[in-house]
A protein has these predicted regions:
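Glycine-enriched, solvent-exposed interface loops adjoining structured elements
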Residues: 1-99, 129-131, 163-326
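Small/polar beta-strand repeat architecture
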Residues: 96-109, 113-114, 119-126, 131-174, ...
């Protein structure tokens, strides 16, 4: 009797968009699909991912980011995509999307993927994207202060040369919302400390009499637009807070499907409901009689995945004393 297992855990990594579409269409009753049906399925998959944005917090899309505070600067913009960033006007002067540092040495070649070194990597994400000028560069790690696993001209930007000391912003595409924010003192040192900021709504922020008043930030207000998320802090940082940072827990959007050879930006636990959801969407186009049972299956599998997703915490039960007639 065979007792050998695969010792492999990469199904989700190798389960391509083409495979997902094929599986969904087989459930609908189409073992062979046309080019138009492939295109329609990929479009439906992207719509499904957008709909998941209304299904609560997806913990695999939660990340952290650090911002460098500047005296007198209270508004920060987090853009959906590099092409959404303004290049002129007042908005272009606002801090956009991340921690600032500088290049330690010029990048003299548009094809260089090594020797890209930062003056400081304190507070930078362990992997992510930096923006220098109008170019995005992705990386997967550090060797000292040098970026490793570099890809130039990412996110449809163009590789360029950059001078020593050029401003570098640790950039995160696909921003959706800010969950938590803290004022961080002495970042990277053994005396580092965080003080949580309170998240306020529009009416509360509107009630602040002097929004230009400077001091130690204690609250923040988030606005969610089509192309960006804007965070405004209060009070405006003063000189004593200019060397401090904001440490942010943010939520990103789920990445688009892209080409048919791509994998999806979805953990393995959500693969069953993703395929069921796509089959449900496709049934509305090609097999209306199957729409209702597919919807029930999809909602059931999605509910289980959402219940499993997240971060569990300890539960404490405290007895409550009750004294009647006192």
């Amino acid at each position: 009797m065979p007792n050998t297992t695969s010792d492999n855990y990469t199904f989700g990594k190798t389960f391509t968009i083409a495979d997902i579409v094929e599986e969904a269409f087989e459930r609908v009753g189409f073992p062979n699909v046309t080019g138009y049906q492939l295109k329609a399925a990929r479009r439906s998959l992207n719509i499904l991912f957008q709909e998941w944005g209304n299904r609560g917090l997806h913990y695999w899309e939660v990340g952290t980011l650090n911002l460098t505070l500047t005296q007198g600067e209270r508004e920060f913009n987090f853009y959906r995509y590099p092409s959404d960033m303004p290049t002129t006007g007042a908005a272009a002067l606002q801090k956009s999307n991340g921690l600032n540092t500088t290049l330690d040495g010029a990048i003299s070649s548009t094809g260089a993927t090594s020797g890209i070194t930062m003056d400081s990597i304190t507070g930078m994400n362990n992997q992510g994207t930096i923006r220098i000028g109008t170019e995005d560069i992705t990386y997967v790690g550090f060797s000292g202060s040098e970026l490793t696993g570099v890809t130039r001209g990412a996110h449809d930007t163009t590789a360029a040369t950059h001078s020593d000391g050029a401003t570098v912003t640790n950039y995160v595409p696909g921003f959706s919302d800010i969950e938590q924010c803290s004022l961080r003192t002495n970042m990277g040192g053994n005396t580092q400390s965080d003080a949580a900021l309170g998240k306020v709504d529009r009416s509360t922020y509107s009630g602040y009499a002097n929004k230009e008043s400077e001091g130690t930030p204690s609250n923040y207000w988030v606005q969610r637009f089509i192309d960006r998320v804007t965070m405004t802090i209060y009070p405006t940082p003063d000189a004593s807070n200019a060397a401090k940072n904001l440490h942010i827990f943010f939520v990103k959007r789920i990445q688009d499907a892209g080409t048919y050879s791509n994998a999806t930006d979805v953990p393995y636990r959500f693969i069953p409901c993703m395929v069921s959801g796509l089959a449900y969407y496709l049934s509305q186009k090609f097999r209306m009689e199957k729409t209702q049972p597919f919807k029930l299956l999809y909602e059931d599998e999605l509910a289980r995945a959402l219940q499993e997703d997240g971060s569990a915490a300890s539960t404490y039960i405290t007895p409550k004393a009750y004294y009647p007639n006192i």
